[in-house]
Swiss-Prot record:
Keywords: Metal-binding, NAD, Oxidoreductase. Its EC number is 1.1.1.38. This is NAD-dependent malic enzyme. One of its GO terms (molecular function) is oxaloacetate decarboxylase activity. The gene is maeA. Belongs to the malic enzymes family. InterPro entries: Aminoacid_DH-like_N_sf, Malic_enzyme_CS, Malic_N_dom, Malic_N_dom_sf, Malic_NAD-bd, Malic_OxRdtase, NAD(P)-bd_dom_sf, NAD_malic_enz_proteobac.
Amino acid sequence: MTTTSRPLYISYAGPSLLEMPLLNKGSAFTPQERIEFNLIGLLPQNVETIEEQVTRVYSQYKQCASDLDKHIYLRSIQDNNETLFFRLLDSHLDEMLPIIYTPTVGQACQEFSKIYRTHRGLFISYPERDRIDDILRSATKDRIKIIVVTDSERILGLGDQGIGGMGIPIGKLSLYTACGGISPAYTLPIVLDVGTNNRELLDDPMYMGWRHERVSGKEYEDFIALFIDAVQRRWPDVLLQFEDFAQSNAMPLLEKYRDELCCFNDDIQGTASVAVGTLLAACKAKNETLGQQKVVFVGAGSAGCGIAEHIIAAMRIEGLSESEARKRIFMVDRFGLLTEGMGNLLDFQLRLAQKSADVAGWTAGTETFPQLLDVVTHAGATVLIGVSGQRGLFTEQVVRELYKHCAKPLVMPLSNPTSKVEATPEEILRWTDGNALVATGSPFAPVEINGRTVHIAQCNNSYIFPGIGLGVVACKASRITDRMLMAASNALAECSPMVTGQGDAVLPPLKEIQQVSRKIALAVAKEAQAEGLALETSEEALLAAIERNFWLPGYRAYRRRSV
């Protein structure tokens, strides 16, 4: 791991040093550093340890009246002293993860222009498309290794949030550091401001983004190409993560660029990887194979279809043919089961459509296509996954029907935020007599049922993407492939308390997430080497590289460097 014992030579001093979040120590500057860096009189006289600072800021955090207030407060610490911010998260990750990311970050995105305090990251707007190289050069960090970028068109389940979507890259990169040990000095959040179709934002006098309807079509594609080209010129080896792009753009962008640069779409690939890791863990715990499952999805967008394709790939690794695997996956959208006769399906949806002959007779009543209950009933479903963004779609009747086919069904309502969840864990467990295995997209409290406490696994992408990023950075992989993602899923499954015999939760507790990220990083890096996408080394060398790149929040001694 990155140590804090070696001194760091810097040329900043006085107020400018205190204004640099990556370097500021606040009250922890030593007496000698205060003299050497002209800080005498700029800070209270008492010198504190980072532990004492954490105690103070945590006390202030607890005084915040609402979750949004807590989010704003944590962001203010991050913008003042990044080391202290991440040390605080390290001490209270369980408590603060829902504050810095889902579900609270959704409200922060909606209120972005109202709660804006200071700059962080880059805002690249369409009217300034001829100056993207200049904008990237203005980034104060030179050694960027991971970028998270959004165009804000599909922020969580909240839709188009304009530049307010910047909260997502900031939050995601905070998790890269807190969970995966990526130094904040190597991360950069970016929002692509291509306008907004959110009328409420366009009419809001406080909205800070470009007041224009969204650019689309060739203009949009050309703008993205300009951005990608500029990023490759500035940081040719960077990992670029696409985040919260609309369904119509997310998959095409990933398909276009995944073989040209090291890129990754967390909504599609990260969600798929953690979902498959969860499903693999449940199968291992039940002594079943993935190929024995019948999986029903509610929601057939890019995220749901991405999970489905990842499951199919995992089934094929187990020995099923592609056609056999596809017959075990059922995608239901607002019109019903995706079938060959359904019009207006996108290419990635067509690949998952069932043959009409195979589902003949499944439709009840006058519906043209089989509905969710029909599908669960006739398919003999054992797994139910929700990525619809619609509250309450997993009704009691649907869940009880699922329970008829499987003594321990896996139910995964993954929609965010909490207000959009398809069913709550309490409901699911009540309807299955406490026998369902439950993993959710948002955090939920443990459920008391039948005299026992059931801990609810949060099927959160933070279990996956930080480890993938750490592995890519450690081995310097040039691409991210499906096999690397599958390696991540398998590594996550092996960490499940149900598999290791250390508990009844499907996924490990968040307090273990840094160790989980290390294991995922090793699996990803080994697969990258096996595919010839990284320089081949020994496992010992990989482990050393992972530890060398794992940053821990602690203050280093500073020495003055002459300009």
